[in-house]
Swiss-Prot record:
NCBIfam families: tRNA (guanosine(46)-N7)-methyltransferase TrmB. Catalyzes the formation of N(7)-methylguanine at position 46 (m7G46) in tRNA. The active site is at D165. It catalyses: guanosine(46) in tRNA + S-adenosyl-L-methionine = N(7)-methylguanosine(46) in tRNA + S-adenosyl-L-homocysteine. Substrate binds at K169, D201, T235, K236, F237, E238. The gene is trmB. It holds the Pfam family Methyltransf_4. It comes from the Bacteria. GO terms for molecular function: tRNA (guanine(46)-N7)-methyltransferase activity. Pathway: tRNA modification; N(7)-methylguanine-tRNA biosynthesis. This is tRNA (guanine-N(7)-)-methyltransferase.
Length: 258
């Protein structure tokens, strides 16, 4: 595998805590003004799922205040969070177990979670309500649209992408989220000194991620103190995966500082 900034190989994971498989969808990339640039095959697997009564009740209480659908409009994060604080974007929050734990560990940051799976978001909303976590906001939709249209350039302190779908079949590699254009987009949204933290349990995808990330000129080895934690909680799904011996590779880059 190519040498990569702060790569860590420390165990396995299962994608069950992320998103559940379903029929892939296709879309188009838009620029910041909303004009279509080129066709894009979406990287996520979207699936419908009914909410429990308790989840729906929590959703009805929490969503109007801390949730929003992805749109073409720039996001005013300080107004939404009610404070100006370092902003971290988590792409693909799944059921939100790691999201909630990391937000509680970093009360000084604003954490924005993007997910397409409504039942997963509902579980996260329940955790936020139960544990009274004040520093999480959630977006439902395609993370690429969030990055392209909703996030201001050079506004993010960090981006987390934990266990993106590896799309292991060669004919599906075009659906992978972490490819060169995505790295360029993420880098453009990070502040100087900001951090990109990626984790995957798929060895071949890890190599492809490392190659694409190392080729991005705005990203480099992180040789300064990180503005966000790199410690992830182990979810029950990841714990099960540890038992079968699938290795996790973690990759961390920093945006170059002038």
């Amino acid at each position: 595998m190519p040498e990569t900034p702060l790569m860590r190989d420390n165990g396995p994971v299962n994608h069950a805590d992320q998103d559940a498989p379903a029929v892939p969808e296709e879309g188009q990339t838009k620029d910041s003004k909303g004009s279509r640039l080129h066709p894009r095959v979406t990287s996520f697997r979207s699936r419908r799922g009914a909410l429990t009564v308790a989840q729906q009740e929590s959703w009805d209480r929490q969503w109007p205040r801390i949730g929003a659908d992805v749109s073409d409009h720039r996001l005013d994060a300080p107004s939404w969070f009610g404070r100006d604080a370092p902003l971290i974007l988590e792409i693909g929050s799944g059921t939100g177990t790691a999201t909630a734990a990391m937000a509680k560990a970093e009360p000084h940051v604003n954490l924005m979670a993007v997910e397409v799976y409504r039942p997963g978001l509902a579980q996260l909303l329940q955790q936020i309500e139960r544990d009274e976590i004040p520093n999480i906001r959630v977006l439902r939709g395609d993370a690429m649209d969030v990055l392209e249209n909703m996030i201001e350039p050079e506004s993010l302190t960090g981006v987390r992408v934990f266990f993106p779908d590896p799309w292991p079949k060669a004919r599906h590699h075009k659906r992978r989220l972490l490819q060169s254009p995505t790295f360029a987009l993420i880098a453009s949204r990070l502040k100087a000194g900001g951090v990109l933290h990626v984790a995957t349990d798929h060895a071949e995808y890890a190599e492809a991620i490392a190659e694409a990330g190392n080729a991005e000129p705005l990203l480099t080895s992180l040789d300064w103190e990180s503005p966000m934690t790199h410690e992830r909680p182990v979810t029950k799904f990841e714990d099960k995966a540890h038992q079968v011996g699938s290795a996790i590779t973690e990759l961390i880059w920093g945006k170059i500082r002038s």
